[in-house]
From Swiss-Prot:
The gene is ureE2. GO terms for cellular component: cytoplasm. Involved in urease metallocenter assembly. Binds nickel. Probably functions as a nickel donor during metallocenter assembly. Gene3D superfamilies: Urease metallochaperone UreE, N-terminal domain (2.60.260.20), UreE, C-terminal domain (3.30.70.790). This is Urease accessory protein UreE 2. InterPro entries: UreE, UreE_C_dom, UreE_N, UreE_N_sf. GO terms for biological process: protein folding; protein-containing complex assembly; urea metabolic process. It comes from the Bacteria. Keywords: Chaperone, Cytoplasm, Nickel, Nickel insertion. Residues 133-156 are annotated as: Disordered. GO terms for molecular function: nickel cation binding; unfolded protein binding. Belongs to the UreE family. The lineage of its organism: Bacteria, Pseudomonadati, Pseudomonadota, Gammaproteobacteria, Pseudomonadales. The keyword Lyase does not apply.
Length: 166
């Protein structure tokens, strides 16, 4: 078994590839198979962002492994105006939906309930198959509503530096 614990900087060469959908790339513990059909065990640090397409890992035996985002069934969402697209993104965000944001479009995992909502909002949805690379979120960590154990959920901002003045 190829055992992997570490993420590393991009490399020019690699010995194996992992083709994983978004759900699998979001797990810190995973048993899967490489593209070369080798049994793989992922034991990554918990609380990190999902693996991204093109990211590199290093196995215990020193081999370099490249992560590839496997195509999956998605909804490609467009709207006739920026306002309507922003409104669609707002309603999807209220439902805590993983969302890939592009220039004039949104992508999310295929879901018939969300499709019906988007149709009611006047959005155009198209079923596609593509790698899914959703936004990780501004705070880069877990999500919770409880105040209990709040010190365990003190994630520094990743996109903004609130309260920092120049």
């Amino acid at each position: 078994m190829l055992v992997i614990h570490n993420r590393i900087e991009p490399q020019a060469e690699w010995a194996a590839e992992l083709h994983l959908n978004f759900e699998a790339r979001s797990k810190s513990r995973l048993r899967c198979f490489s593209a070369e059909n080798e049994d793989v065990g992922l034991f990554l640090q918990r609380g990190q962002s999902p693996l991204r397409d093109g990211e590199f890992l290093q196995a215990e035996d020193g081999r370099i492994v490249r992560v590839c985002a496997r195509p999956e069934k998605l909804m490609h969402v467009t709207c006739s105006s920026t306002f309507e697209l922003t409104r669609a993104a707002y309603h999807l965000g209220n439902r805590h939906v993983a969302l890939q944001v592009g220039d004039g479009w949104l992508r999310l995992l295929d879901d018939y309930v969300l499709k019906a909502m988007l149709d009611q909002l006047g959005a155009t949805t198209e079923a596609i198959e593509a790698p899914f690379q959703p936004e990780h979120g501004a705070y880069g960590g877990g999500h919770h509503h409880s105040r209990a154990g709040e010190e365990d959920f003190n994630y520094p901002p990743r996109m903004h530096q609130f309260g920092v003045r120049k």
